[in-house]
UniProtKB/Swiss-Prot annotation:
Lineage, uppermost ranks: Bacteria, Bacillati, Bacillota, Bacilli, Bacillales
HAMAP family the UniProt entry points to: Butyrate_kinase
Family: Belongs to the acetokinase family.
Name listed for the protein in its UniProt record: Probable butyrate kinase
EC numbers: 2.7.2.7
NCBIfam families: butyr_kinase, PRK03011.1-5
GO molecular function: acetate kinase activity; ATP binding; butyrate kinase activity
Annotated coiled-coil segments of the chain: none
PANTHER family: ACETATE KINASE, BUTYRATE KINASE 2-RELATED
C-alpha cells in the first residue's frame, strides 16, 4: 500500500517541497530565497510565517488537495542527541526547536512547518534521521580531555539513506551490514556503520575530521589557541574560520569545487595541492573508520554532491580500494529519504519513535 506524504526541507537559502505517493513523486519544487528576502529576519524563527506562505503557495500552484495527505514530514533540526529512525513530532520537540535549545539552523523549521499543516489536517507529522543522530559507541566519545566529549553531528539522513539503498542493491538489509560511508559536500562526514548503527563519526560541523569546501576540519590545537588570544579576531570570526570560511575557501578563495577542479585541470599548483590534500584527509578518515570496524567491511560508500566528481572520487578510490570495494552513490536526495522513512512507518515495516 502506498501513502501520500508531503516532504519539507528548509535550507538556509531555499525551501524544498515534494509530494510522494509511495515512492512515486507527484511533484517536487525548490523555492530559492534571495538575501534581500531574508534580510528583514533577525533569526531563523522569524522566518516561520514566510516559509509557511511559501509552502501554501507551492501546494496551491500544483493544484494538490492537501486533504489527500496521510502524513507530513520535515527535515530534522538541531535537537538533543537521538538514535536513528523516524520520529513523531511532539510539543516537546517543537519547544526545543523554537527555543533553539541545541542550536539555530534553518532545518529547525522543518518539524514546525510539518506539525502546523498536519495538525490542521489531523494527520501525523514526522522527522527522519536528524543531524543529531547519536549511536556512537562509548569509547568513541572519549576526546582526550575529561572536560569535553566527542559529539555526533553529521549528515545522518543521507548516510542512512545511502546505506539502505546500497544494502538493498547488494541483496541484504542495512541492519545486517558493515559500511564506511563518506558524505562529500559543503561539509564532509565519514562514519563507521556497524549493522545499522553509526558507531563512530567525525563531527562535520564543529571542526573535526577532514577539511571540506568551506569547513576547516581538525586543526593544530595550539596554533588555533594562539589565534584565539591574539586579539585579531572576534569569537564569531574565529567560528567562521572553522565553519563557513575554512577549507577550500581559506586556500583558494572559493567553495565551488567546480572552480577548484577547473584550476586543477589547468595545472594550478596551489589548487592541485589543496585538492589532493582534501582527498588525502578523506581517505585517511576512511582508514580510521575501517579500524573501528576491525576490517570487517562490506563496502566503502562515497555519497553527497562531490561524489559526482570523477576526479575527486578517483583519488579517494586509489588510496582506499585495498581495504574493500568502493561504491559511488552520488548526490543526496533528502526529500526521498524523508519520504522513505515515513512510508516504512505507515506501512508497518518500522515503528515510529518518540522524542
Amino acid at each position: 500500500m502506498s501513502f501520500d506524504v508531503l516532504t519539507i526541507n528548509p535550507g538556509s537559502t531555499s525551501t524544498k517541497l515534494a509530494v510522494y505517493q509511495g515512492d512515486k513523486v507527484l511533484f517536487e519544487e525548490t523555492v530559492r530565497h534571495t538575501m534581500q528576502e531574508l534580510a528583514d529576519f533577525n533569526n531563523v524563527q522569524e522566518q516561520f510565517d514566510f516559509r509557511w506562505q511559501v509552502l501554501r503557495r507551492v501546494m496551491d500552484a500544483h493544484g494538490y488537495d492537501v486533504k489527500n495527505l496521510q502524513a507530513v514530514v520535515g527535515r530534522g533540526g538541531l535537537l538533543r542527541p537521538v538514535a536513528g529512525g523516524t520520529y513523531m513530532v511532539t510539543e516537546k520537540m517543537i519547544d526545543d526547536l523554537k527555543e533553539n535549545k541545541y542550536g539555530e539552523h534553518a532545518s529547525n523549521l522543518g518539524a514546525m512547518l510539518a506539525k502546523k499543516l498536519a495538525d490542521e489536517l489531523t494527520i501525523p507529522s514526522f522527522i527522519v534521521d536528524p543531524v543529531v543522530v547519536d549511536e556512537m559507541q562509548e569509547i568513541a566519545r572519549i576526546s582526550g580531555n575529561a572536560f569535553v566529549a566527542r559529539k555526533s553531528i553529521f549528515h545522518a539522513l543521507n548516510h542512512k539513506a545511502a546505506g539502505r539503498k546500497i544494502a538493498k542493491e547488494l541483496g541484504n538489509d542495512y541492519e545486517k551490514m558493515n559500511f564506511v560511508i563518506a558524505h562529500l559536500g559543503g561539509g564532509i562526514s565519514v562514519a563507521a556503520h556497524r549493522q545499522g548503527r553509526v558507531v563512530d563519526v567525525n563531527n562535520a560541523l564543529d571542526g573535526d575530521g577532514p577539511f571540506s569546501p568551506e569547513r576547516s576540519g581538525s586543526l593544530p590545537m595550539n596554533d588555533f589557541l594562539e589565534a584565539c588570544f591574539s586579539g585579531k579576531w572576534t569569537k564569531r570570526e574565529l567560528h567562521e574560520l572553522i565553519v563557513g570560511r575554512g577549507g577550500m575557501i581559506s586556500y583558494l578563495g572559493t567553495n565551488s569545487m567546480l572552480e577548484v577542479e577547473a584550476k586543477v585541470q589547468a595545472g594550478d599548483v596551489k589548487a592541485m595541492e589543496a585538492f589532493d590534500a582534501m582527498a588525502y584527509q578523506v581517505s585517511k578518515e576512511i582508514g580510521a573508520c575501517s579500524v573501528v570496524l576491525q576490517g570487517k567491511i562490506d563496502a566503502i560508500i562515497l555519497t553527497g554532491g562531490l561524489a559526482r566528481s570523477e576526479l575527486f572520487t578517483s583519488k579517494i578510490i586509489e588510496q582506499t580500494n585495498w581495504i574493500t570495494s568502493v561504491i559511488i552513490e552520488p548526490g543526496e536526495d533528502e526529500l526521498e529519504a524523508l519520504n522513505s522513512g515515513v512510508q516504512r512507518v505507515l506501512a508497518g515495516l518500522e515503528k515510529e519513535k518518540e522524542y
